[in-house]
Amino acid sequence: MVSKSRWKLLAMLALVLVVMVWYSISREDRYIELFYFPIPEKKEPCLQGEAESKASKLFGNYSRDQPIFLRLEDYFWVKTPSAYELPYGTKGSEDLLLRVLAITSSSIPKNIQSLRCRRCVVVGNGHRLRNSSLGDAINKYDVVIRLNNAPVAGYEGDVGSKTTMRLFYPESAHFDPKVENNPDTLLVLVAFKAMDFHWIETILSDKKRVRKGFWKQPPLIWDVNPKQIRILNPFFMEIAADKLLSLPMQQPRKIKQKPTTGLLAITLALHLCDLVHIAGFGYPDAYNKKQTIHYYEQITLKSMAGSGHNVSQEALAIKRMLEMGAIKNLTSF
């Protein structure tokens, strides 16, 4: 006959097992709820100021007073010089920047500026977008932000065809601006170094091209309308690096860690928009050497060696934003 103490032990073990199973299920549901936001049949309500309030909690002492794009009037008479050099400020690059701002623009399109509540999606370049069929849903957002040279032509079913803004830097400008963008797309230069300003000036003014000072040769011919070019305020790079990744603003020359264009775009969207969704973010696990990282090309994590990006640290930052509801994800993360 089984003793009472034996029965008590078995009952306790069974209870522990039930609790463990319940906790596992609840955690799995919570993970899905936090990090994967299926496309709703109806538009999600857009609450004015929602992203701003979440950003304030995320970034601390945060203000929307900063302009999104650098403006000529702020550099014609510089009253408060920037504290940092590129990519976190413009210290030492003011004269070159002034020439670029004189031939580009800094305005936000009226159709975006006039929106009472701005619904935005940041479309990453991740492999998760392949066969996602998110194209129609992406096209319905007020603002669609794309990154670098990610193609649209041929992938419309998965990534959509609308492009409000495309963030790029010289080395990532290897795309046809007329094929991969819309006629009114804003091409937003993310400057990492003074040579980036020099490059865009020579392209737009048809001056002698610069070939040195880049880790990859940028285009020498680039058919764009100067009035579609914007220069991103380095403030957003500073916020992404400092508040999201805790990177020091002054780093040894050999280290030079910096945020990816994707994390930078999310930071920008939280400043510009009232509702922020993301799609196509995330990288394979470090041990997965064969999984491609982009939806449009066959390259792996190995290609990011020496890039100065800490993708694991960025993943934690994005998950933190997802957990607090500052952003929502249209693809798994």
Curated annotation (Swiss-Prot):
Post-translational modification: The soluble form derives from the membrane form by proteolytic processing.
UniProt keyword annotation of Cell division present: no
An example Gene Ontology CC term for this record: extracellular region
Coiled coil: none
Catalytic activity, EC: 2.4.3.2, 2.4.3.4, 2.4.3.6
Gene Ontology MF term list: beta-D-galactosyl-(1->3)-N-acetyl-beta-D-galactosaminide alpha-2,3- sialyltransferase; beta-galactoside (CMP) alpha-2,3-sialyltransferase activity; N-acetyllactosaminide alpha-2,3-sialyltransferase activity; sialyltransferase activity
Catalysed reaction equations from the record: a beta-D-galactosyl-(1->3)-N-acetyl-beta-D-galactosaminyl derivative + CMP-N-acetyl-beta-neuraminate = an N-acetyl-alpha-neuraminyl-(2->3)-beta-D-galactosyl-(1->3)-N-acetyl-beta-D-galactosaminyl derivative + CMP + H(+); a beta-D-galactosyl-(1->3)-N-acetyl-alpha-D-galactosaminyl derivative + CMP-N-acetyl-beta-neuraminate = an N-acetyl-alpha-neuraminyl-(2->3)-beta-D-galactosyl-(1->3)-N-acetyl-alpha-D-galactosaminyl derivative + CMP + H(+); a beta-D-galactosyl-(1->4)-N-acetyl-beta-D-glucosaminyl derivative + CMP-N-acetyl-beta-neuraminate = an N-acetyl-alpha-neuraminyl-(2->3)-beta-D-galactosyl-(1->4)-N-acetyl-beta-D-glucosaminyl derivative + CMP + H(+); a ganglioside GM1 (d18:1(4E)) + CMP-N-acetyl-beta-neuraminate = a ganglioside GD1a (d18:1(4E)) + CMP + H(+)
Transmembrane residue ranges: 9-26
Lumenal side: 27-333
UniProt cross-references to Pfam families, sorted A to Z: Glyco_transf_29
Gene3D superfamilies referenced in this protein's UniProt entry, alphabetically: Glycosyl transferase family 29 (3.90.1480.20)
Organism in which the protein naturally occurs: Homo sapiens
Keywords: Disulfide bond, Glycoprotein, Glycosyltransferase, Golgi apparatus, Lipid metabolism, Membrane, Secreted, Signal-anchor, Transferase, Transmembrane, Transmembrane helix
Lineage: Eukaryota, Metazoa, Chordata, Craniata, Vertebrata
Pathway(s) it belongs to: Protein modification; protein glycosylation; Glycolipid biosynthesis
Protein name per UniProt: CMP-N-acetylneuraminate-beta-galactosamide-alpha-2,3-sialyltransferase 4
Principal location class: Golgi
Membrane-side (Cytoplasmic) residue stretches: 1-8
Described function: A beta-galactoside alpha2-3 sialyltransferase involved in terminal sialylation of glycoproteins and glycolipids. Catalyzes the transfer of sialic acid (N-acetyl-neuraminic acid; Neu5Ac) from the nucleotide sugar donor CMP-Neu5Ac onto acceptor Galbeta-(1->3)-GalNAc- and Galbeta-(1->4)-GlcNAc-terminated glycoconjugates through an alpha2-3 linkage. Plays a major role in hemostasis. Responsible for sialylation of plasma VWF/von Willebrand factor, preventing its recognition by asialoglycoprotein receptors (ASGPR) and subsequent clearance. Regulates ASGPR-mediated clearance of platelets.
Entry comment describing in which tissues the protein is expressed: Highly expressed in adult placenta, heart and kidney.
Compartments where found: Golgi apparatus, Golgi stack membrane; Secreted
S-S bridge residues: C120-C273
Similarity annotation: Belongs to the glycosyltransferase 29 family.
Membrane topology listed for this record: Single-pass type II membrane protein
